[in-house]
UniProtKB/Swiss-Prot annotation:
Protein name per Swiss-Prot or TrEMBL: Large ribosomal subunit protein uL5
Protein role: This is one of the proteins that bind and probably mediate the attachment of the 5S RNA into the large ribosomal subunit, where it forms part of the central protuberance. In the 70S ribosome it contacts protein S13 of the 30S subunit (bridge B1b), connecting the 2 subunits; this bridge is implicated in subunit movement. Contacts the P site tRNA; the 5S rRNA and some of its associated proteins might help stabilize positioning of ribosome-bound tRNAs.
GO biological process, one term: translation
GO molecular function, one term: structural constituent of ribosome
Pfam families: Ribosomal_L5, Ribosomal_L5_C
Subunit structure: Part of the 50S ribosomal subunit; part of the 5S rRNA/L5/L18/L25 subcomplex. Contacts the 5S rRNA and the P site tRNA. Forms a bridge to the 30S subunit in the 70S ribosome.
Top-level taxon in the UniProt lineage: Bacteria
Length: 180
């Protein structure tokens, strides 16, 4: 079963990118590999309930249970010790990845206050895109009244593109709202 965005990729994005970059084979066209969501919750060291709420929020947003991340080293200034839970992350692939990106592009990003588009310079040099979200309440799955605290998250989109130009063209073909 193909999602709406996956069908759009096969019917519209692949032919457009083949024409733009001169690919001879459809398998050469860059594609999305995975979307990784990460939520760092530094306050979780002092209060375990905060981490439980963050995990619940992320599981609603992603549709799957996130993994709790633990600190690797003790840092006295942050008051954390080695092995303490300090965040959560989840990796979306295939259908869940396309469904999440569809919701992100068409529903969540337009709900951001004073939104002018995502930065076109957030590529890592190898064709992957990273962005941050300041509030988890932009996602429709989160009930605004039930939120205990406003938390942000990192979103990393991994592609098979070899250059940033190919990756930007791929995401722009998916109607990603780039600022520049």
């Amino acid at each position: 079963m193909n999602t709406r965005l996956e069908k759009f990729y096969k019917e519209n994005v692949v032919p457009a990118l083949m024409k733009e970059f001169g690919y001879t084979n459809p398998m050469e066209v860059p594609k999305l590999v995975k979307v990784t969501l990460n939520m760092g919750v530094g306050e979780a060291a002092s209060n375990k309930k905060i981490l439980e709420n963050a995990v619940a929020d992320m599981s609603k947003i992603s549709g799957q249970k996130p993994v709790v991340t633990k600190s690797r080293v003790s840092v006295a200034s942050f008051k954390i010790r080695d092995g303490w839970p300090i965040g959560c992350k989840t990796t979306l692939r295939r259908a869940k990845m396309y469904e999440f990106l569809d919701r992100l592009i068409n529903i969540s990003l337009p709900r951001v206050r004073d939104f002018r588009g995502v930065s076109g310079r957030s590529f890592d040099g190898r064709g992957n895109f990273n962005m941050g979200v300041k509030e988890q309440i932009i996602f429709p799955e989160i009930d605004f009244d039930a939120v205990d605290a406003i938390r942000g998250m990192d979103i990393a989109v991994t592609t098979t593109a070899k250059t940033d130009a190919e990756a930007k063209a791929l995401l722009a073909a998916f109607k990603f709202p780039f600022r520049n």
